Amino acid sequence: MLEFYGKRFESRLLLGTAQYPSPSILADAVRASLSRIVTVSLRRESGEARAGQDFWALIKALGVAVLPNTAGCHTPREAITTAHMAREVFGTNWIKLEVIGDTDTLQPDPFGLVEAARILCDESFEVFPYMNDDLIVAERLIEAGCKVLMPWGAPIGSGRGLNNPYALKTMRAHFPDIPLVVDAGIGVPSHAAAAMELGFDAVLINTAVAKAGDPAAMARAFALAVEAGRLAYEADPIEARDMASPSTPLLGKAFL
């Protein structure tokens, strides 16, 4: 069972709530995904606006846990301010910390991320840092107090899947006891299954579901892929080989 900061969840699929064609389609996708955690952007879903109130009512009706994020923040100060606002609006210490360093690739700023994470952890936030796949950055985030890491698979919204599976596999081996979530870049369910087969604890999907022709159907496909990938990992799959290995026994074969 998935566990973040002492809270346990049956589903290993986290779902973003941005870019859906309508609130009803979002609700259908969340239900189809079986996800128990959704991410929310405070900047987009202001609790003071009527639209924000309607959105918040929809999320509460779904009965899912909310993971607010600091999307769009480019400095530690900006991210910290947004995190405090999110805690007040959504009533949770959870925060998906994003400090963006490059506007073209939306690559996280590792230096600003670690700085903001250290301050927020000291202020009793439970931080989910969106990061690259660098082991040293991961070490610094853990030292800062993060108990979950969210390395990217590929740039946000790119749909490229896992750009560097070797780095992700290395991170899994290096941090066997830290919950790891592949965040960003997942395009199709097979990408999610591949991440889970590497031993990751969960994946976060947004654009691939929200922008699909049928978001609810795609959400269901991702739910099945995540489950299949996890089962495959737990089943201890065979290692890839460079040469063939016969699978049919020779017993009973006629020799001339």
UniProtKB/Swiss-Prot annotation:
Keywords: Cytoplasm, Schiff base, Thiamine biosynthesis, Transferase. Pathway: Cofactor biosynthesis; thiamine diphosphate biosynthesis. It is found in: Cytoplasm. Pfam families: ThiG. GO terms for cellular component: cytoplasm. The keyword Transmembrane does not apply. Homotetramer. Forms heterodimers with either ThiH or ThiS. This is Thiazole synthase. It comes from Brucella canis (strain ATCC 23365 / NCTC 10854 / RM-666).
